[in-house]
Amino acid sequence: RYGTLALDTGESLDSAEATLATATIAYSLRDDVEAIQWMHGHVQETGELPLLEAETVVRSLAIAMHSQSEIILPLLQLKEFDQYTTTHSTNVSVLAMAIGEYLGFAGRELRVLGVSGLLHDLGKVKIPREILVKPGGFTDEEFAIMKAHPKEGAKLILDRDVRLEVPAVVAYEHHIMLNGGGYPAFHFARDTHYASRLVHVCDVYDALCTNRPYRAAWTSAKALDYLEEKTGTDFDPVFSLPFIKMMKERSVQRLSLEDPEVKPSSPSPPGGEGDRG
């Protein structure tokens, strides 16, 4: 169903020890994915967020990142379009913790970034599936429904625990650009939370690198070029420039959750610019 991306320092992961380690990560990720799928289903059915499961997944992802001598970023590869919210949420959580650690965050701050990344799209459980997987453009009515997911996500998170203020704010703000564009629109100009600006970078990068019903995946290089081009308007340079540097410092390897053999990645076909949600 899925694949992963492991980012290392350029050395080949061809030893038996490395293969065993990456296979262990793959099996762990399968458990994490199943937990997230269950969590989304539980929220959809009951309206209640199982916080313990969310925190457990974030801790598991953090452990997977540090399971070898170099930091590994286990990013899931989408196979079926209706799995997008699950795989994307996992990837954004990993990327948010990775750039946070790269910038010197630690401990609770990193866990908050991980939980914020994991829950940033939680409001999509309220969006009809036919809209989420629709090929082609949205109608005005469909886009209005899609644009409600930040508010829905923030409400679901705050209803669970008011102490989840940062993840709730990130869920609300993650589609707002540095220049104030995006959605939901503010009634007056103000800065977004720093965690929202950090997650926004991770969110757009992973969305661009993922096949969607309405466009093919971009290569990592093309997505990073887009982040650089939009830095200062869409993206905060405090986070986008270190993110670009971090991703360029590491080479990409692919491995399948069904088959732990490490395989070189192949370029993805480019698509149109930007992402709709």
Named regions from a protein language model:
Residues 1-79, 265:
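Non-catalytic interface/linker regions that flank or bridge core catalytic/transmembrane domains
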Residues 36, 58-62, 72-76, 96, ...:
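Short alpha-helical scaffolding segments that buttress acidic/His motifs in well-ordered protein cores
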Residues 61-66, 83-91, 122:
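All-alpha helical catalytic cores of prenyl diphosphate-utilizing isoprenoid enzymes
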Residues 74-80, 88, 104-170:
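Divalent metal-dependent catalytic cores for phosphoryl transfer on phosphate-bearing substrates
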Residues 82-113, 186-191:
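Alpha-helical phosphate/pyrophosphate-handling elements in metalloenzyme active cores
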Residues 91-99, 145-158, 219-232:
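An active-site-proximal "capping" alpha-helix that borders the catalytic cofactor pocket
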Residues 117, 157-160, 165-200, 214-264:
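Histidine/acidic-rich helix-loop-helix segments that form or flank divalent-metal centers
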Residues 272-274:
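Glycine-biased, low-complexity coil/linker segments
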